[in-house]
Amino acid sequence: MSSHHTNPRSLLNAATHSLIERVHRAGRPPMAAMTPAQAREFYDIGGPMLDLQPAPQVDRVEDISLRARDGHTMPARLYAPRCETALPILLYIHGGGFSVGSLTTHDVLCRQLSRLGHCAVVSLDYRLAPEHRFPTAVHDSWDALNWLHQNGQTLGLDTTRLAVGGDSAGGTLAAVCALMARDADLPLRLQLLFYPGCIARQDTASHHTFAEGFMLDKATVDWFFNNYIDQADRDDWRFAPMNASDHAGLAPTWIGLAECDPLVDEGVQYADTLRMAGVAVNLEIYKGVVHGFITLGRAIPDALQAHADAGRALKNAFER
């Protein structure tokens, strides 16, 4: 798709335009002007106010902990519908620029994916930057996936049916985990990627077109990445999965993108790269919406369609 547009604001649908206007009028302070602790608190409190309310009902919601390679205990939350047989597992890795986000900010989304995908969802609270810079989040995500593969049965889950997913920075981490899983011969049914970051440098047309005024702005992207990674590491495929030497043999892939998002072009490029490598890819581009819309369901109803599409992709992958 081409992200060159003379009036990109005209692409926004009515609900998204209204939300952006309300946020602008509210004088929301930019994350880049906050400390990481302030930004996390702001997102934890403010984010859920724009998501579906009340939170969708799921039969089983349980806080658990997973073990990282250095002995760190990673908090996680298990969501599961009632089922007589062992459920398949989606490891979900939240977005937030590797710097913010939590089990709280993505609670509604994980409930939706569990309900609609008829699967267990394990939401991971991985360590954040700048306190824990690259590649800690990669290690935590991969360690969690391995833990579930080896120990998921202790939670009553089916470890032979495993998927990984995430949004934004979490989508990057999920894509990296899918590459690692292929190399480790750990079979995945699906990688589920909402607007993932895929490239080393943010220089696509969409990064210029949607740099300001579309929820995720350039200053915030720069702040996130300065928190997380040194310039010398930017070409590492564990930050930029597009840079992996080979994409053949990856799990079937579902990618959901927002049309008015700085990251949309790299998401399309990644889908094309996977297809060229022979990977089965289902790409959905949601018109008129912005980065982060899947956790803004109260404000942007298109989130519900994306939830349904992703849930269907999970269900189909686990039933194959």
Segment roles from a protein language model:
Residues 1-78, 319-320:
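A glycine/proline-hinged amphipathic helix-loop "lid/cap" segment
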Residues 86-95:
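Short beta-strand element of the alpha/beta-hydrolase
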Residues 104-123:
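Short amphipathic alpha-helix adjacent to the substrate-entry channel of hydrolases
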Residues 132-153, 310:
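Alpha/beta-hydrolase active-site loop
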Residues 149-164:
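Gly/Ser-rich "nucleophile elbow"/oxyanion-hole loop immediately N-terminal to the catalytic nucleophile
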Residues 179-233:
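Hydrolase active-site cap/lid region
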Residues 255-257:
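Short beta-strand/loop motif that positions the catalytic acidic residue
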Residues 300-320:
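Catalytic active-site module of serine/aspartate enzymes centered on a nucleophile-bearing elbow/loop
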